[in-house]
Amino acid sequence: LSRGLGDVYKRQQVPSVSFEGEEKIATPNPEVYVYDTSGPFSDTEMNIDLKKGLPRMREEWIVSRGDVERLPEITSEYGRMRRDDKSLDHLRFEHIALPYRAKKGEAITQMAYAKKGIITPEMEYVAIRENMNCEELGIETHITPEFVRQEIAAGRAILPANINHPEAEPMII
């Protein structure tokens, strides 16, 4: 028997890393936190505006690495055609940003970072989320940010993180 008691936010070593969890109680056992994959839609403090889009939670992480640049304009023929079609104006979102791309000579995948020995905020986010409850329950875990990096570098895990979708929550496969 369990019931949701509301959202709980965990914040760890990287100041901009926090994620939502939901507290569950299965009496008479201790509280258990499960991570909430519904994104901001279950956050009662969040004002959802579909025209503005979701918060770009990873954008600061992406830009701070210094290996991407924003395109000066929409570069695809199809994208320019859609942009110039006035009959679509009533459908446009307010939040469309120009896309990013890797700077010349840069590899910007999580695997490339992992192989260079770099632990990204995305990797730390995954480790934190995968370890919910472990510390409180006295469970020693091996899912550290370094473990996540090693698994990605070895090709045993992937962390899809498109730079042009900074609203996407990091996850690991």
Locations of regions flagged by a protein language model:
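Single conserved hydrophobic/aromatic residue that forms the stacking wall/gate
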Residues: 1-5, 9
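Metallocofactor- and cofactor-centric catalytic cores in central/energy metabolism, strongly enriched
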Residues: 13-24, 28-173
